């Protein structure tokens, strides 16, 4: 009602001032339109959470008095990576907010699904998210991550808890986008780190979570559409049934080796050196050698070999010639 009254007042003001509107040939982007929307008073909001008999949250808007400090990340000073390499997200976007729901029991399964608290994604995915975060900062927002890469063991736990392919991918026959390392579940927070109002909470399996946006408040719809436009602009595609779910447009195979829960520091234990090979086979091509007692990071295990990162080079070493440091 207040929006209609505002519109009528604006109309008469323009009429009295002699102003007129000539439609342009180009359609303004949603971001531009969203920034021009007048703020509505709190009593005009009605949260979709009332459908679930929950207390409505206060919608959050950018606070111009709060400045988002932009972290300096120089890619030239970072280890050289290939597009498909797994990297730690906060190494590249230090100010991103992380709250991995499946690292706790605060999720629809009621149990801890995986035992790591850092976000790991493909390098190409992270580069695109850097662009997303940069644009959001200009609007007074940041990304908050609820879920990202899931090992197949984690996907199996989710499937066992809710074996419905509309909401959870079958780990053995489904697309498993989260197990490919190019998919992320996100929402928006303001400069102070508070979540903005969205159509639903995370992992809501009702139709209120889809991208229709007609069954939620204007504020929730505007925030979800803002997130969607910026994510799509930088190379992501959303899942129709989940407003928070986005997949990078570069496709990858399902990752069957890397597991962030097994990441640990080891050292070579041999007479002189061990071979870092391109595949888990004793006759595979040698990428480089690792001198005795030198340390490396174990990323996963397969058939008696460790998949490791040694000074930016990734490959496989025989697990018989190494010992754990931490």
Question: Where do the model's predicted regions map?
Answer:
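Sec-dependent N-terminal signal peptides of Gram-positive bacterial secreted proteins and lipoproteins
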Residues: 2-24
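Extracytoplasmic cell-surface/polysaccharide-interacting catalytic and binding patches
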Residues: 19-146, 160-241, 247-264
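Segments that shape or occlude catalytic/ligand-binding pockets
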Residues: 151
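SH3-family beta-barrel domains
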Residues: 261-275, 288-292, 299-302, 323-326
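Short alpha-helix capping/helix-loop boundary micro-motifs
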Residues: 280-285
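SH3/SH3-like beta-barrel fold
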Residues: 306-310
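A short macromolecule-binding patch
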Residues: 311-322
């Amino acid at each position: 009602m207040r929006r209609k009254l505002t519109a009528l007042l604006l109309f008469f003001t323009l009429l009295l001032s002699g102003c007129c509107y000539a439609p342009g040939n180009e359609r303004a982007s949603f971001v531009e339109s969203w920034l021009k929307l007048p703020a509505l008073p709190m009593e005009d909001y009605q949260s979709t959470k009332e459908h679930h008999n929950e207390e409505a949250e206060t919608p959050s808007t950018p606070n111009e008095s709060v400045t988002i400090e932009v972290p300096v990340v120089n890619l030239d000073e970072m280890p050289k990576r290939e597009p498909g390499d797994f990297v730690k997200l906060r190494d590249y976007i230090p100010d991103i907010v992380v709250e991995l729901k499946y690292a706790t029991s605060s999720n629809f399964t009621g149990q801890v699904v995986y035992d790591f608290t850092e976000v790991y994604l493909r390098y190409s995915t992270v580069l695109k998210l850097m662009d997303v975060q940069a644009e959001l900062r200009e609007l007074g927002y940041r990304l908050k991550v609820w879920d990202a890469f899931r090992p197949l063991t984690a996907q199996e736990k989710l499937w066992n808890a809710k074996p419905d392919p509309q909401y959870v991918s079958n780990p053995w026959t489904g697309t498993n986008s989260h197990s490919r390392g190019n998919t992320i579940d996100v929402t928006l927070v303001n400069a102070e780190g508070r979540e903005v109002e969205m159509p639903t909470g995370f992992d809501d399996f009702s139709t209120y979570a889809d991208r229709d946006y007609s069954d939620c408040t204007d504020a929730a719809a505007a925030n979800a559409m803002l997130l969607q436009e910026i994510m799509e602009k930088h190379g992501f595609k959303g899942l129709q049934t989940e407003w928070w779910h986005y997949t990078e447009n570069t496709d990858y195979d399902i990752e069957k080796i890397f597991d962030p829960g097994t990441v640990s520091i080891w050292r070579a234990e041999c007479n002189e050196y061990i071979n870092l090979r391109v595949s888990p086979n004793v006759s595979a091509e040698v990428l480089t050698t690792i001198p005795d007692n030198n340390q490396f990071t174990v990323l996963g295990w397969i058939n008696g070999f460790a998949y490791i990162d040694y000074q930016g080079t990734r490959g496989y070493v025989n697990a018989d010639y190494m010992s754990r440091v931490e």
